[in-house]
Amino acid sequence: WQYKPTGISTDYQFRSYDRNCINLAASVVMPDAADANKLLFDKYAAGWAYASDANEVYINVWNYGPGWSIEVTENGKSLSVSKASSSLYRDPLHLYVYQIKTFKSSTSETFATSSCGHMWMVTASSPTSTLEIKVSDPFGNVYTETMTRPKQLDVETYRK
């Protein structure tokens, strides 16, 4: 079995995020929204609702399960991959594309961004280093990305 993204090949099984380029604080992404909406959005966006310069990269492997593996290298050196903090379980691109629009005018969670348990992270040594990401499934399929950083969080960057 494979996860099949809508309108995208089954060869696309994960998405990577450069945390240095993500600040989903309501004051930044919806400055004109009502204060109650901003407060709720910041709580909802949790770990994405502030700026960071920690050189962390997050990898959302949608179909991750037993037998999968994630390897990341920076300049030929392996980086330690760990499970992301639960405050970073919501996919930041989904928050950016869908939830900002919703929370600008409402406090209801229409088309809510679900919390996921398949978000992983590594810490790079530099904000401009290129990472090689390799994700393998238990069936021998290998999915790769050369992640050039900085990698902005916007629709065009992630359009396939």
Regions found by a protein language model. Give the residues of each.
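Metal-dependent phosphoesterase/phosphodiesterase active-site architecture
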Residues: 1-160
